[in-house]
């Protein structure tokens, strides 16, 4: 093990002792915010320190076996123990490297998923609806809750734009690499000649902002307009100004919510989405800088990047960032995303390991 890696692990072991001492103090118990932060830190430290202690135990066993090599009666057994121990040390060191990877503090959070129709008109809007159904099915299989925050339906079905909140432990960590341009190649329902058309949608995945600490929104930076809600296809039209449009003047970000009959609830939803967008803007600027430095393939924060193609005639889905092609389009559109999300996460960890090896 590299001395720098050992030193880092020793620091974490020492920090765990400090955190345990702090959690035992009466002052900490009286401050719930501090108690929660320390408890979260302890939960992250404990598995790393436990794995390091196990590693040290195996290392000590190998050292003891090496001392036994000089005894002719014990030499054969000692050689076996050394061989087995060194193999375990190699495995444990690889596992410790994974545990040392920087954790995204947002991975455990719920998220806002925004899908916008792009090139392709009505067909693009229909595909937006298909993507929403795909993500909703995936969320349901994992026991997450999906709530529509805002929607703008198209005349033929689907959505010009739709924003949903996906509430569940680890939702953002699993879906954060879905941001980008999704391209579909298929024969549209409106195509009489049977020709294949190409259209695209843009997906944005944003972690839910912590109202207490993540984003501070100055009320004087907001312009709030109310108007009467309306819907496509003969939906009800409110007779009161229940719809809300919030503009964040410094950034120009605009959020509209009109799905609820209550103006107060629409305003609450719009503020949640605005906070997530502001947090997302900060994150993407940081990720773009880091990606340029690391030459990262995924997680660059670039929403215009074409990340995936769904080819219906061939029944295939291709993720262009990792050159992965799966011939299971129907299952994927029904929400079977684990193979895709797992491969993206593995690639991200490989990039992190390469960077960690460079830094340690």
From Swiss-Prot:
The keyword Protein biosynthesis applies. SUPFAM superfamilies: Release factor (SSF75620). Pfam families: PCRF, RF-1. Keywords: Cytoplasm, Methylation, Protein biosynthesis. The modification N5-methylglutamine is found at residue 235. Its main location: cytoplasm. The keyword Kinase does not apply. One of its GO terms (molecular function) is translation release factor activity, codon specific. It comes from the Bacteria. One of its GO terms (cellular component) is cytoplasm. Methylated by PrmC. Methylation increases the termination efficiency of RF1. Signal peptide: none annotated. It is found in: Cytoplasm. Peptide chain release factor 1 directs the termination of translation in response to the peptide chain termination codons UAG and UAA. Belongs to the prokaryotic/mitochondrial release factor family. This is Peptide chain release factor 1. It comes from Bordetella parapertussis (strain 12822 / ATCC BAA-587 / NCTC 13253). The gene is prfA.
């Amino acid at each position: 093990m590299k001395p720098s890696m050992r030193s880092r692990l020793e620091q974490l072991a020492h920090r765990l002792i400090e955190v345990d001492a702090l959690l035992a103090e009466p002052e900490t118990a009286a401050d719930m915010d501090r108690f929660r932060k320390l408890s979260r830190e302890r939960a992250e430290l404990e598995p790393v320190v436990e794995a390091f202690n196990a590693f040290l135990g195996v290392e000590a066993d190998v050292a003891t076996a090496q001392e036994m090599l000089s005894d002719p009666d014990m030499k054969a057994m000692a050689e076996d123990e050394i061989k087995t121990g060194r193999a375990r040390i190699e495995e444990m060191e690889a596992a410790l490297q994974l545990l040392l990877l920087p954790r995204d503090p947002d991975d455990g959070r719920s998220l806002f998923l925004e899908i916008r129709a792009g090139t392709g008109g009505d067909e693009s809007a229909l595909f937006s609806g298909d993507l929403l159904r795909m993500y909703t099915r995936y969320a349901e299989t994992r026991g997450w809750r999906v709530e529509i925050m805002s929607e703008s339906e198209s005349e033929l079905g689907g959505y010009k734009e739709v924003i949903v909140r996906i509430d569940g432990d680890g939702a953002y960590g699993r879906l954060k690499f879905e941001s980008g341009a999704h391209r579909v190649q298929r024969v549209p329902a409106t195509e009489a000649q049977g020709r294949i058309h190409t259209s695209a949608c843009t997906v944005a995945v944003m972690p839910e902002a912590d109202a207490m600490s993540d984003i501070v929104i100055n009320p004087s930076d907001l312009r709030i307009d109310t108007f009467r809600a309306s819907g496509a296809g003969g939906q009800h039209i409110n007779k009161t100004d229940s719809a809300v449009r919030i503009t964040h003047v410094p950034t120009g970000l605009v959020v509209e919510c009109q799905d609820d009959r209550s103006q107060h609830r629409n305003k609450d939803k719009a503020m949640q989405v605005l906070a997530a967008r502001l947090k997302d803007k900060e994150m993407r600027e940081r990720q773009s800088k880091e990606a340029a430095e690391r030459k990262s393939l995924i997680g660059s924060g670039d929403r215009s990047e074409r990340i995936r193609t769904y080819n219906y005639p061939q029944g295939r889905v291709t993720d262009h960032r990792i050159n992965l092609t799966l011939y299971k389009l129907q299952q994927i559109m029904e929400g079977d995303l684990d193979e895709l999300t797992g491969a993206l996460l593995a690639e991200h960890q490989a990039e992190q390991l390469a960077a960690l090896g460079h830094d340690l």
